[in-house]
C-alpha cells in the first residue's frame, strides 16, 4: 500500500489567505470586483475565483477604469496605482501583505531621507518585473537597482554607498551570498548597510521542505509556473530528492512515476491552495 502525505507546512501564506478571503467576502455580496493582476500565482485558484465572478485586469485596463471597486493583491503596488485610483474614483480594497507594506515604507523612508547630493544606491534583490518588486521600485520613483542573482552584484558601483533590501519571497541563502560579495568589494570610503526583509513564513519553509523531500521516495511539487517562491522551494526539493517533479495540476502527474514507490510526498508553494494538493492525492489514489 502506497503512503501519500501532503506537507502540512505547504499552502497559502497568511498574505495570500487574506487577499483571497477579502475577494470571496466581496463577491459573496454580489458586487462587481476587479483584481489588479492575478490574485495569486496559481492558475487553478485564479480559475476558481473567476467562476465566482472575480475579474482580473492589467494596469492598462485599470487606468481606463472609473467608478469601480478593485482589489490590490498581496504583492503590493507602487504609489502611481493609488494616484490613478483617486483620479478615477476607484474604491480600493487593499490586500497588500503587511510584510510587504512594511518593506515598502522602509524603502520609501530610505529614499526620502537620502540627500540629493548623496549618491546612495538603493538595491533590491528580487525578480525584475515581479509584482512585488515593481511596487518596491515604485517607492523610489524607479531609481532603485534590482539584482536577480548574486552574480549581478558585480554590476554595482562599489565606490558609492549601498543600501540592500530583498523581495520578501527570495532565497535567504542567496541574499547572504550577495551581502558577502558586497562586503568584499565595497570601497573603504563607501558605506554598506543591508536589511534582511525576507518573510520568515517563507524562509522557514526551506528547512521544512528539505526534511519533507528526504522522507519520501517520490515528490510532486504542486505550483503555478509564475510562482517565484515556488521555483526556489522546488529547486530545494530537487536538490534533496532528485525524484521530485513540478506539476501545476493533477492531470500533469506522470503515471509511470507511480510504479514501485512506497512513499509519495505532495507539497507546494505559498501560492498553492490546499484543495489542489488534495486533488493531486485523489488522482494518485484512483490510479493506484
Curated annotation (Swiss-Prot):
Pfam families: LYTB. It comes from the Bacteria. Binds 1 [4Fe-4S] cluster per subunit. InterPro entries: LytB/IspH. [4Fe-4S] cluster binds at residues 13, 97, 199. Keywords: 4Fe-4S, Iron, Iron-sulfur, Isoprene biosynthesis, Metal-binding, Oxidoreductase. Its EC number is 1.17.7.4. GO terms for biological process: dimethylallyl diphosphate biosynthetic process; isopentenyl diphosphate biosynthetic process, methylerythritol 4-phosphate pathway; terpenoid biosynthetic process. Its cofactor is [4Fe-4S] cluster. It is an enzyme of class 1 (oxidoreductase). The keyword Thylakoid does not apply. (2E)-4-hydroxy-3-methylbut-2-enyl diphosphate binds at residues 41, 75, 130, 168, 227-229, 271. One of its GO terms (molecular function) is 4 iron, 4 sulfur cluster binding. NCBIfam families: ispH_lytB, PRK01045.1-1. Catalyzes the conversion of 1-hydroxy-2-methyl-2-(E)-butenyl 4-diphosphate (HMBPP) into a mixture of isopentenyl diphosphate (IPP) and dimethylallyl diphosphate (DMAPP). Acts in the terminal step of the DOXP/MEP pathway for isoprenoid precursor biosynthesis. Belongs to the IspH family. This is 4-hydroxy-3-methylbut-2-enyl diphosphate reductase.
